[in-house]
Amino acid sequence: MSPEHTHTHEHPLPPSGNGTVLLDIGDGVGALVVHAPDGLDGAGLDGVEIELSHRGERQAFVHTEVRERRLPEGSVYAGVFPAVAVGEYTLLGLDGAPDHEVTISSGKVTEISLVR
């Protein structure tokens, strides 16, 4: 959590199933999917909130929770930002410092991976 993000979520959300995530993309709006470690190596982010800021700023304006996503080919862990205005953004690390720069394009889904 960044210093500005002061609340926590007491009840982790259960895994989501195939087809249960709705993206609201179109003219001037895209989405961001952040693939995360699965936790088998101890580095998992399941249940952790990840935050997005406007590029050049360190204050998050939106956050989402990394969750298990159950797909026909197996489970993956990801955080989904379903509707983000076109622009330049920074995914903040757990310490609130800039971690990944991303560009959101109109009507498209941008994907990045935190899996190392």
Predicted features and spans:
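A short tyrosine-centered beta-strand micro-motif
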Residues: 76-94
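Short, solvent-exposed secondary-structure boundary motifs
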Residues: 12-15, 70-73, 91-92
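A generic structural micro-environment signature
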Residues: 42, 72, 87-90, 108-110
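Short, acidic Ser/Thr/Gly-rich low-complexity loop/linker segments typical of extracellular
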Residues: 58-78
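A generic structural micro-feature
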Residues: 24-26, 71-73, 81-83, 104
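Primarily secretory-pathway and cell-envelope proteins
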Residues: 1-65, 95-116
